[in-house]
């Protein structure tokens, strides 16, 4: 995918923190650029479930408007503390060392970014788990899919129930967007 090689300063800082923490499970730059572009369209409160060391948060921060803020939840205190150092002087980003479910009372959110496999695992109901956390017209971005051109969608030799649920849930308009030959995201807008 075509993109300028330079990264926003806040994203570079997040990569540095991730490297020092030995944390390598973060969103790709292609996904990050998409997050920044989507964040630029949102006002109010954006949220991320699964901060890691803050790379996804940094991409969101690089795009948010003046009338927006970000709440991000990371269950692992060590990772949350590392991410918090990136945003220590930024009153528009709050990093919380909590389970994502504790943010239920802080919504609804205008944009919600989360890993496709957590917390909306199909065992928990997928979109049912998220629906009340997103405002009408709000956007959910689910990361970490492998592109699939078949229907029903297949992952690791089985029907990808989570992807199928999101793509067919009538409460959302959802599209799978390929961000690289080996990576895709789902973008779901609440009706």
Spans of model-derived segments:
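Active-site flanking residues adjacent to catalytic metal/cofactor-binding acidic residues
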Residues: 47, 73, 114, 137-144
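Short, well-ordered coil/turn elements that cap or connect secondary structure elements
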Residues: 65, 88-90, 106, 135, ...
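Structured loop/turn residues at beta-strand edges in well-structured enzyme cores
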Residues: 41-44, 107, 170
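A short acidic, Gly/Pro-enriched loop at the edge of an enzyme's catalytic core
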Residues: 105-112
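Rossmann-like AdoMet
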Residues: 1-26, 39-42
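SAM cofactor-binding core of SAM-dependent methyltransferases
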Residues: 23-102
């Amino acid at each position: 995918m075509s993109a300028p090689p330079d990264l926003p300063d806040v994203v570079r800082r997040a990569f540095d923190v991730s490297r020092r923490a030995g944390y390598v499970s973060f969103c790709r730059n292609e996904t990050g650029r998409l997050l920044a572009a989507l964040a630029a369209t949102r006002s109010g409160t954006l949220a991320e479930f699964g901060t890691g060391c803050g790379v996804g948060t940094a991409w969101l921060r690089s795009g948010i408007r003046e009338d927006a803020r970000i709440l991000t939840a990371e269950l692992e205190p060590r990772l949350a503390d590392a991410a918090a150092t990136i945003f220590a002087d930024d009153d528009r980003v709050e990093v919380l060392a909590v389970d994502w479910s504790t943010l239920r009372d802080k919504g609804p959110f205008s944009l919600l970014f989360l890993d496709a496999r957590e917390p909306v695992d199909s065992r928990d109901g997928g979109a049912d788990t998220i629906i009340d956390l997103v405002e009408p017209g709000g956007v959910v971005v689910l990361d970490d899919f492998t592109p699939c051109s078949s229907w029903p969608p297949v992952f690791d030799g089985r029907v990808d129930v989570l992807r199928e649920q999101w793509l067919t849930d009538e409460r959302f308009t959802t599209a799978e967007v390929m961000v690289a030959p080996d990576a895709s995201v789902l973008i779901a807008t609440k009706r």
